[in-house]
Amino acid sequence: HEKLVFIDGEMKELQNYPPLIEANVLSIMVAHIAVKNNTTYNTDGMPATTSRRIVTDLLRDSLNFNGLIVTDALNMGGVRNVPEAEVLAVQAGCDIVLMPLDADKAYDRLLEKYTTDEQFKIEVDNSVKRIIRAKLALGLMNEE
């Protein structure tokens, strides 16, 4: 929790995910772990939370996960020194960002990006749809 840790090479832990996804797990939390020496999913020294290769290419596209993708706490050591980590996490494909160092600044950066970047706006709008679907599935909202 205090520093960025690395997976070196093959990601053996991935074998646990397909059965969970097939069982319709509603959400997956992405950890602040970097991947190195992996030609497909190398995160270039950045936490997986901020990596489109991990969040979108792997979880969404390769593993066909359609539920919510949530960051681990953004105030943790493995990611707290990454500038605009909350924006990078959303750009990577995360739907929900947890515990940024400064929630007000994070909100301002996310709002600025949302209002000035059409692709980012599309990502956020898709995340909102997934969040609403999850709430409906859990009976937390009416369909009205």
Question: What feature does the model see in each segment?
Answer:
Residues H1-E123:
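Second-shell residues forming the walls of enzyme active-site clefts
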Residues T115-E143:
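Mid-to-C-terminal alpha-helical segments outside catalytic/metal-binding sites
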